[in-house]
Amino acid sequence: MKVLIATDGSKYGKWATEWVARMPFAEKPDVSVLHVTDVEALRAPFMFQPVVIGNEPFIQEEIKRIEARGKTAMAEAKAQMASLKLKGKLVSERGAAGSTILDRAPKRDGLVAIGSRGLDALDRFMLGSVSTQVTLHAPCSVLIVKEEPRPLSRILFAADGSKA
């Protein structure tokens, strides 16, 4: 089974990696950890509004900060995988987070694990929710992680009788 862990370096992304490491797969999964740097989102407001002269240096400074955060997230993901004895590859890409994750998502027999920041309805509307986008459009199962892993005491299995 192919497993894609999408991380942004937050505690939720790290928890997703921990959940995957603890899952009892029948066979050892082919794991990839993906971090997406979305720098185009910085320019998005200026595509529809007149550009204020002098903004570009600030945008470039913010791009450098975001890229540095991405490098830190990848270094932390590498260390976390080693500490969890989870073997796999690390992938860093630039683009829109949701669509890049969907492009990299395993087909049918795979799994995408992604953290959820727990945005309220207004924030989801204003900022967009990557986990919601992935859940709605992924070609495979999606594990949304909202809390750090702990031993499971109860499991609810819901079935509607369909093949899915």
What are these regions (language model features)?
Residues 26-33, 81, 111, 135, ...:
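Short, structured motif recognition centered on aromatic/hydrophobic residues
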